[in-house]
Amino acid sequence: MSSNEKIFSVLRAPRVSEKTARLQEISNQYVFEVSNEATKADVKAAVEQLFDVKVKAVNVVNVKGKSKSFRNRAGNRGNWRKAYVRLVDGQSIDVTAKA
C-alpha cells in the first residue's frame, strides 16, 4: 500500500457541524471520521502528511451506531470512530476546500 492509500484509508472525512466550527475557532481543534482500526499515531501521521501542519494532540472516540427501524424491521447503523486533532498554535486546515 502506498503512502497516499494509507492516508486516505485512515482519514475518511472531516466532520463539519456547529460544534466542530466552534472547536476550530476556540481551541484550534479539527474533527475527522477515521477508520475503525486507526490509532492515534496513524491519525497524527496522516494529518501532518496530508495537510502539511504540525499536530499537537489527538483524541479518539468510538461512536456507537444508533438503532433504527425501516418498514417495521429493526436495524442498526454501523459503529464509527471520530478523531479530535489539535494543531499547534498559528496553524490551520481548510476542511471546506473542494478537491
UniProtKB/Swiss-Prot annotation:
The keyword Iron does not apply. GO terms for molecular function: rRNA binding; structural constituent of ribosome. Keywords: Ribonucleoprotein, Ribosomal protein, RNA-binding, rRNA-binding. One of its GO terms (cellular component) is ribonucleoprotein complex. GO terms for biological process: translation. It comes from the Bacteria. InterPro entries: Nucleotide-bd_a/b_plait_sf, Ribosomal_uL23-like, Ribosomal_uL23/eL15/eS24_sf. Coiled coil: none annotated. One of the early assembly proteins it binds 23S rRNA. One of the proteins that surrounds the polypeptide exit tunnel on the outside of the ribosome. Forms the main docking site for trigger factor binding to the ribosome. Part of the 50S ribosomal subunit. Contacts protein L29, and trigger factor when it is bound to the ribosome. Belongs to the universal ribosomal protein uL23 family. PANTHER family: 60S RIBOSOMAL PROTEIN L23A (PTHR11620). This is Large ribosomal subunit protein uL23. It comes from Xanthomonas oryzae pv. oryzae (strain KACC10331 / KXO85). The lineage of its organism: Bacteria, Pseudomonadati, Pseudomonadota, Gammaproteobacteria, Lysobacterales. The gene is rplW.
